[in-house]
Amino acid sequence: MSLVEVRVEIPSAEAEAVNELLLEQELAAWSVFEDVVVGRAWLIGLFPDQTAARDAAAALRPLLPLAAQAEPGYREMAESEWRDSYKTHFHPWQFGRLHWVPVWQRETYVLPAGHHALWLDPGLAFGTGNHETTRLCVERLVALADEFGTAGLVVDAGCGSGILALSAAKLGFRDVVGFDNDLEAVRVSEENAVLNELNGQVRFFVGDLVSGLKDVQAQVLMANILADVLIRYASHLVQAVRPGGVLILSGILATEVAQVRAAFGQEAPDWAIESKTMGDWSDLELRRPAGVLEL
């Protein structure tokens, strides 16, 4: 198997803005790489063939800041080469009893008793899970799994490549769904479920923050989406959490968290709210008071 790499050099000053764009547009096949020593940055994507690579580059270009619209370079990479390129910067990481491990370590990685691994393959547009927005969510999720056990519905709203929903299943939650308004994201999520032998255990479907949350009463609802989208759909997100349930919001720049907190405080004034910050990003955890389920 071979892949086509697309590489665009971007100004290092634009790296954070481009990374935010990738998250907002859910462009899982692309990543931003920075060399802070030399002050250079690149936007890199991997695609199955030249046609897909050129189409993706053409679609992305008008979305980029003008300063980041350099001409892309294309090169075909053998399977061994593109896997090795990821091995240099992608290493296992862990929080609590869940480990996120590159699939090429599947035969050698040693898990402690009672721990679980989610196998990641960046070549499948899975990403590494290492971005602060994802890590904030999964750290909350691990803690909630210890608190709630396996009871209740877990929903990953805007699932992207499925890492949060699949992490929930690995932690033992039995009723897990994920949705995205991008058909390609749903397809990738389903592929990643197969990679982790979770196909049939997690249901993925195409939906948005209105249709995907219709009639939902989640024990845990996760939305790793940018701040403006969270604010716009605050009422839908709040209404989809059952009494005693938890809403986890991420994808929020630290400079925007007060604005998001205020918006959700208006929608859910009696909910307990707390926040954590990691790097330039913050999350919010909102807990709905236990009470009678609204019909």
Swiss-Prot record:
- Gene Ontology terms describing biological process: methylation
What keywords would UniProt list here?
A: Cytoplasm, Methyltransferase, S-adenosyl-L-methionine, Transferase
| Keyword Methyltransferase among record annotations | yes
Among Pfam families, the record links this protein to:
PrmA
Q: Which domain of life is it from?
A: Bacteria
Q: Where in the cell is it found?
A: Cytoplasm
| Cystine crosslinks | none
Q: In the UniProt record, does the keyword Zinc occur? A: no
| MF term (GO), any | protein-lysine N-methyltransferase activity
In this chain, S-adenosyl-L-methionine is annotated as bound at: 134, 158, 180, 224
Q: What is its main location?
A: cytoplasm
Q: What are its E.C. numbers?
A: 2.1.1.-
Q: Which Gene3D superfamilies match?
A: Vaccinia Virus protein VP39
Task: Give the InterPro entries listed for this entry.
Answer: Ribosomal_L11_MeTrfase_PrmA, Ribosomal_PrmA_MeTrfase, SAM-dependent_MTases_sf
Tell me a GO cellular component.
Answer: cytoplasm
What chemistry does it catalyse, as a reaction equation?
A: L-lysyl-[protein] + 3 S-adenosyl-L-methionine = N(6),N(6),N(6)-trimethyl-L-lysyl-[protein] + 3 S-adenosyl-L-homocysteine + 3 H(+)
Query: Which family does the entry's similarity section mention?
Result: Belongs to the methyltransferase superfamily. PrmA family.
Q: What does this protein do?
A: Methylates ribosomal protein L11.
Recorded protein name is: Ribosomal protein L11 methyltransferase
Q: Could you tell me which species this protein originates from?
A: Opitutus terrae (strain DSM 11246 / JCM 15787 / PB90-1)
